Amino acid sequence: MWKKRNFFIGILGVFMLAKGWAQSERFSVMTYNIRLDIASDGVNRWDNRKTPLLHQINTIHPDVLGVQEALPHQMTELHKGMPGYQKVGVGREENYTGEASGLFIKTSRFIIKDSGTFWLSRTPEKISRGWDAACNRVCSFVRLEDRRNGKQCWVFNTHWDHVGEQARTESLALILTQIAVRNPTNEPVILMGDFNTTPEHPRLKVLENDWVNTFAALNPGSTLGTFNGFHTDTPNNYIDYIWISRQAFTIHSSEIRTEKPNHQWLSDHYPVLSVVEIKP
């Protein structure tokens, strides 16, 4: 009797250890257009939003966070308010002022092996504006090594122009070229950010063979969007994405976070949060 009991306890222990190891391989990724700090937002200004927004981020505690529209002081305030993260990314304007598409990496989970920023233009290595864009636009990236298993991956975070149709199309082509050049060994890649493009647009068709939209994959038929504009709790304008290399990852969960504590908008976008795992 005791031998049987000990045998089943042993099997249960092995199962629990295996389950715990599998879970430890997973990591969370979040993309968040935090809305720039601008006086015309009135009650929704950054000063009113930053404390609850930081509380939201620190509660979720993502392993990788990509933000858009972050001005230099917002990047600094986020970094100060998020212990245990390293920040990557610079502003898009002269002297690296202006909005950043920044990344925050949890240092207890990942080692940053490479990082940088390029401009979405014909001269990506220079501060510049591309095609018919209304603004300078950037993409910041990191190459990460997982401290738990040594696996490596890339993360690219971007914010496409809100006006220029050609700029949005060319931005995607440029980013895919940059990924190919920087990642010749085809390591797993995450591409995320505010694309200012809805899912049905033809420009995104180029991603369908090699990439997976994490939210769409696990929430087929969902009509919930990400751009709330500070005025609708259930938007249908989906423009914020987390894409992953199709063959490289398992997706465990993906959701749009719609918290609105005490009726306070945290941003004019909802963040997208996905939990993924690099395949063996």
Description of each model-found segment:
Residues 166, 170, 180-189, 197-280:
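Metal-dependent phosphoester-hydrolase catalytic domains
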Residues 64, 68-154, 252-256:
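Structured beta-strand-rich core segments of catalytic domains in phosphoester-bond hydrolases
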Residues 34-37, 71-74, 92-96, 109-110, ...:
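Solvent-exposed loop/turn segments at secondary-structure junctions
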Residues 2-8, 20-81, 92-98, 279-280:
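N-terminal, active-site-proximal structural segment of metallo-dependent hydrolase catalytic domains
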Residues 31-51, 96, 120-134, 161-164, ...:
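Acidic/histidine-rich helix-loop elements
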Residues 36-43, 67, 113, 165, ...:
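Short, solvent-exposed loop/turn elements at domain surfaces
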Residues 43-50, 67-72, 97, 135, ...:
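Solvent-exposed, acidic/flexible segments
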Residues 26-34, 53-78, 104, 142, ...:
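Active-site beta-strand/loop signature of hydrolases that rely on acidic residues for catalysis
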